[in-house]
Amino acid sequence: MADMAFTCASCGAQLEYAPGTKAMKCHYCGHENPITASPWSTVAEIDYAAGLAEAEQQAPTETVSVVSCKRCAAEFQLDPAIQASRCPFCGTPIVLEAREVTHLTPGALLPFGFDAKAARAKYEAWLSGLWFAPNNVKRLAKTDNGFVGMYVPYWTYDAATTSDYTGQRGITIVRTVRDGNQTRTVTETRWTPCSGRVARDFDDITVVASRSLPEGYLDRLEPWDLGALVPYDGRYLRGFGAQHYQVGLADGFDTAKAKMESVIRGDVRSDIGGDRQIINALQTDYAAVTFKHVLLPVWLNSFRYGARTYSFVINGRTGEVQGQRPWSWVKIGLAALAAIAVVGVFLAVYGGQN
């Protein structure tokens, strides 16, 4: 992501990427300069073991103007046209310094699908639709800064998995027991040991490689249209920021394996069958593991309401908004009282009939 200058073919002014297109636009004369990829450029999967060895031994290096935040430890590149004095991740004042960083360069990215004006409209719609929010939140909430378009680093992993397991299958038995002159129903589970093997192929398990944003919010921006990935091209970064990864390739794969295991356990339970399942042991082998280092588009901003600042993120492709928000405890209390009243009426009507 080295600093590169892209000039307009018509007037020579600086260009910026126009979201939602495959062109760079000159804001001086309006001329559009198409982004044409090499016919040999592809979005390639990289062998995990080979990539890990490269990361440890001789990852490609480049010198960029890196913005370092001392509060949240974010390191990211800002386009020179972006006049930012605060970290877009946590709002702390930032210092621009040029230094050499060593990292795996991205192999692909998803271009932004809409501009900052559209991002603001999506934020306002999200704010208006919040349940149990104060009535005046839309009128009083003020965004702290302009919207910053940031390419956030991700790893994606593919793997062919084979999992051996041992466990127990539970079958529910309902029987009637006579106790003197009375009968009662007894429910019990009969367990039998079982073992087996399940297999599943995983494609593009995404892992956030940034620690500067709450992972939960970024996870809820999914799904990403990864089928629209384009080979990495610095021209798509003009007018936007790009963060360097903070989660390494190996640590990212550990997170990916945890995501895979959740799915695999569901497969095992289906394979065990019965009414209830217990997994005693599970051993998974991972084969044909490949990865991609990609940049995904996120709009960042925060707003002030009362004495607090609330951060939020927007998927730069789908417009999905996630973030912190204020709550109206008065509305929540009234809703709770209403629910209690409904339950009370139900018990009074139907309980009295019984």
PLM region descriptions:
Residues T61, L104-R304, G352-Q353:
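Charged, low-complexity helical/coil segments in non-catalytic cytosolic or luminal regions
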Residues C8-C11, C26-C29, C69-C72, C87-C90:
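Short cysteine-rich clusters marking metal-coordination/redox-active sites
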Residues Q324-A335:
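Juxtamembrane/start-of-transmembrane alpha-helix segments at the extracytoplasmic/lumenal side
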Residues T21-K25, S38-A44, A81-R86, R99-T105:
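Short cysteine/histidine-rich zinc-coordinating motifs and their immediately flanking basic loops
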Residues D3-A5, A23, E62-V66, A84:
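Residues immediately within or flanking Cys/His clusters that coordinate Zn2+
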Residues Y17-A18, I35-T36, L78-D79, L96-E97:
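Short, non-ligating residues that shape and space the ligands of small metal-coordination modules
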Residues G344-N354:
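Juxtamembrane boundary at the C-terminal end of a transmembrane helix
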Residues L296-Q322:
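Extended, hydrophilic extramembrane loops/domains of integral membrane proteins
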